[in-house]
Amino acid sequence: MKSIKSIFIFLLMLFCRNSFSQSIEVLQSGTKTSIRGLSVVTDKIIWASGSNGTVARSTDGGNTWQWLIVKDFEKRDFRDIEAFDSNTAIIMAVAEPAVILKTKDGGKNWYKVFEDSTKGMFLDAMSFADEETGMVIGDPIKTKPFIAMTVDQGETWMDPVRGDTSKLPTLFSGEAFFASSGTNIFIKRDADYKLIGGFASGGMKSRFFTEKENFFIPMIQGKESTGANSVAINNNNEMIIVGGDFTNDTNATGNCALSNNFGKTFIKPQTAPHGYRSCVIYINEKQLITCGTSGIDISNDGGLNWKLISTESFHVVQKAKKGNAVFLAGSNGRIAKLIL
């Protein structure tokens, strides 16, 4: 009986240890760039983008990296990137003029596929449902969010409402979108191959928007530095939104909300992430990872409870589209890998 009890205790300890046994391995650091764009194509192919016109690429799982400065865009901030293979990627420069560039030769040459010099234009994030269909969102122009879509892998971009802004939601004063990790918007194909999606705002008000509806998110809001930063959805259409207050990044108040009905109702986690978080992703249907300037958290129960695994600062985290590898990136050119 005693031996059975000892075995049970041993197995319990082993389970508890393995439940949150993840760690972070820093692969790159020291490059003068703040990385907020990250796209992991496979376990081997990773692209990243950031300030000072910088793009990074690895084709061997992060063992070696090629660092590029995009010619004529040396002072631009590429806040998001979408890569399709080792040669093809799209990068997004945020401020006036808003610019989207594309490469087909691994970053050696880039060409312009979109430009908008409208006063106040500021692009925040991109999302792709597949290799052809994507959407970009930007801060409001005259109270209306800027949205553009592509159906040809970013070669051309179009206005989905064809100038009829009455079809777009009206944003409150001080409500906008954070360009913190390129993940406050998502589009995907449902089981019937129908295009679905949504995006989350922050600032004075924080809401989640679908094509026809919008819902207030029960998160901290009311200041320009508060609200939703990132939204993720799994194959069961379970959704999670993270954010907080980036000026008080250890404050965990109102930094996470979960929904299983596209934002109609939200619940708060039982144990929240440990501070402001700028990005969240699903590793699998129940396991998630979130990161921010005050650390990294893991959840093994769909986002209800979070465990701090590192106090290292990162802006963005992404999993391989085709594979299992998870990478993170942040300031000072830091790129890391999650060790499961």
Segments (PLM) and residue ranges:
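Residue-level hotspots at or immediately adjacent to binding/recognition sites across diverse folds
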Residues: 22-340
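Bacterial Sec-dependent N-terminal signal peptides
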Residues: 1-23
